[in-house]
Amino acid sequence: MEEQLYLDAEGPLLPLHTSISLFLMSYCDCKTWKIFLVLPDSKANNLSKNILLPRNLELETICKCDLPPLVRGCRLPAVVEASGAFCRAGLAVVLRHITHKAHIAEPSRNDIIELLGFKKTCLKACAEVSQWTRLCEISIPRAIESFLKKPSATIPTEVLQFEKKLGEPVKVHNDDKIRRQKLQQQMTANTNEAVDAKSNTAKTMPCFDIITNKTSLELGAALSKLTVQGALSRATREPSHIRKAKNSDLPPLEHVFAEGLYFTLTDVVLLPCIHAFLVALSNVAEEKCSELPLIAAWYKRVQQVPGVRFAASMCNITFLDILCENAKPQKMLSTFDSETEEKEIQDSNFVGGPRPTMTKLKELGIEAIFSSHPCPSWAIDWESLPAAASPAEGKMSSERAVRKQQQLNNLLSVVTNIAKPGDTIVDFCSGGGHVGIVLAHKLPSCQVILIENKEESLLRAKERCSELGLINIWFIQANLDYFTGSFTIGVALHACGVATDMVMDHCIKARAAFAISPCCYGFIQNTVKTSFPRSCRFQEALNYKEHMILCRFADQTAVQLPAERRQIGKQCMGLVDLDRAWAAEQNKYKVQVITMEPESCSPKNNMIVGSPI
């Protein structure tokens, strides 16, 4: 049975996330999927007449109440396997999965697998850490959907940000080779012009047959990667004077596509969005399009990619004819920076130790508070568990497996003490599922859900669960923001940086109890949804820079460091987590910060335990 793709179809027009997904499906010409357009319960089987669907795809409609249980707890788009126990949710995750499956179905189509970019990492990182994922998955679709509802002559900031990015220097693997080829092409063209001024045809580089006198070497290089067999190998080396040319003498590369030189999923995401925006902008203020010369040039180049015009015609997209002569970045764009980028520049180079900040807090009566462990001697009999349930089954040394068992003992002692039959327990940032698998095995009357953004980790967890024959466990590959289902307990072992705060916020919103082990304090920083300090009392005492000092030094707890520095690091950990605990208490939670037993189980041995009052 094929996988099922669920797309939102609420409203008079298709949401951009849905349009993007359908555009990719048309580009890949996928035939092995069952595609559902999800309608509100009251409008089941009543798709808006304004919606034009792709002509090369078969689609069905379904109402929300009939969705599979796992899909009901996720934001769309979402893909669910035939078993109904493994779901992928969120635009970036779903698009990457569609691309993988399409290439498996047609291995000869190099243009499909090249969408994933260098090392197959395009849109792999979550929006919290990747500017491109954030721009494609959140910023651009959200801004343009708002613009479409109320078009005006004001260009959204997010679109200007994309224009700015198209003017940034190209960063591409092995660019030295391509720049030398460009130098040789330029020198060859100059020689030909000198020999025969009447000739308009320059010699074609043997590496890129597709290049013409109207096509840049960069675009030719990009398009050659999208042919069935990919780019041809160079038959000969460059001449000596080309090989010996200094790097500083090589010509720069043109910014061809969104992320640089090659056509990727990023372009697939942005094309339907930018097209819809340009159509709307042209209707209200056509002259404003001239303020986006780089986007206009990109918009034309994308249309030259094999398969794009076919997908566009299938999706009822009629491209606009936009002038983009001498596309250069506008002067105003050189000074454009998002608030986030400005904040990062402002605070990235601060200096100073933690003592002044700690002293300041102490004078205000704020010191790290560690509650006693509720079950310090509680431990699972790991020897009695099936091998697949033990961390030793994962890819780690025996010494590390023992420490992992000790860490699990701490979290599991809390969860098993409060869990009741019928509870839903979510293992956030689950990785290979060490916490969730043991919980599912020990608590068969509870439903366990693993949520993890890394597909490889989740697939390993799925294999282990198959060995154990567990039927009370579900898997969701997604950023945790895309999980919207109800649950009673949330757990996270070593949630990295701001992920701890995201998990806590998710639990508080669901009024669920939580047991979280924070990690990577040095990666904590303000995000679109989360700002620091977290609690009112810490906000009154510290500014962002002072809080970041605590976070940086909270990471200095490694065993090889001097004891005094480790102790300071532990106190900084305690203060950062105290701020988190007080923030939760402001939302009517009872919260404790506890040290794991034994303390040697991890340098990051804090545990934040909370329950709604």
From Swiss-Prot:
The keyword Cytoplasm applies. It holds the Pfam family Methyltransf_32. InterPro entries: Glutathione-S-Trfase_C_sf, Methyltranfer_dom, SAM-dependent_MTases_sf. It is found in: Cytoplasm. Residues 116-312 form the GST C-terminal domain. Keywords: Cytoplasm. Gene3D superfamilies: Vaccinia Virus protein VP39. The keyword Cytoplasm applies. GO terms for cellular component: cytoplasm. It comes from the Eukaryota. Belongs to the GSTCD family. This is Glutathione S-transferase C-terminal domain-containing protein.
